[in-house]
Amino acid sequence: MEQAEFLEKTRNAYLEARECSFLPNSNVSVLSRGTSHSISSITEDLFGCYCAEKVAEPNGIKILIDPPISFKGTELKNKSGKRSLLLRPDIAFTKDNIVNCFFDIKTDLGYKRFEFLNQAKDRNKQLNTIKDKYAHYKDGKTKINQKVEISSDIKFIYIVISQGNIGREKMNEFISGIKLLENVDVFVISKGEHLNSYNDISKTEINKADFDRLDKLINEKLNG
């Protein structure tokens, strides 16, 4: 899958999300949605496919979509300190049962944009506590427990699909702050018109600099 195809499929997902999931056998014209469906799970699946096609040798590689990664049985706890730490990345890469990368896919920064940098700083600290630790997740189909180890070089990557909903100056401020963090990075993979725009989508462009850097990171983590 090429970069342009990824953005095109995301755009199509937005368009389909405006429609009803089911249509009646008659009187279709009376039915209309006032809000769109969420496409979060679709973008997770789509990015998983995008990455899977880049795997050179599949033996030992797993691309986990929305895995609940639990540290139950270790000293690691959640913020309240009452329960075992549980991570829910959108995507996780494992190579020979070692987790080397987490991804958080954001369609845009939306209303949470002012929390973004603080969230990234919290993630950076959290990754330092889980390096070289063991965890487990349950396979979504079989529910069989799978044991994994967190790499000493674990990374947490934010992928922002659309720059829309936030000004360029504020976006650059967030990105500059995140670039200072040891374990966290961010890639904004399109620019111009938001992919959910009701205007002409030709105004959306691939952000080649970031998308190419993202591709390089994916290749390093899956095939390095």
List PLM regions with ranges:
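Active-site beta-strand-loop-beta-strand hairpin of nuclease catalytic cores
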Residues: 84-104
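Short loop/turn segments at strand-loop or loop-helix junctions that form parts
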Residues: 66-70, 103-108
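Charge-rich, solvent-exposed alpha-helical interaction surfaces
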Residues: 6-9, 13, 126-133, 213, ...
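Catalytic cores of nucleic-acid endonucleases
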Residues: 105-189
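Charged, often glycine-rich, active-site loop that binds/positions anionic groups
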Residues: 68-90
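Non-catalytic C-terminal interaction segments of nucleic acid-processing enzymes
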Residues: 163-224
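Long, low-complexity, intrinsically disordered N-terminal extensions of eukaryotic proteins, enriched
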Residues: 1-5, 143-144, 152-161, 211-224
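Interdomain/boundary linker segments immediately adjacent to catalytic/signaling cores
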Residues: 1-75
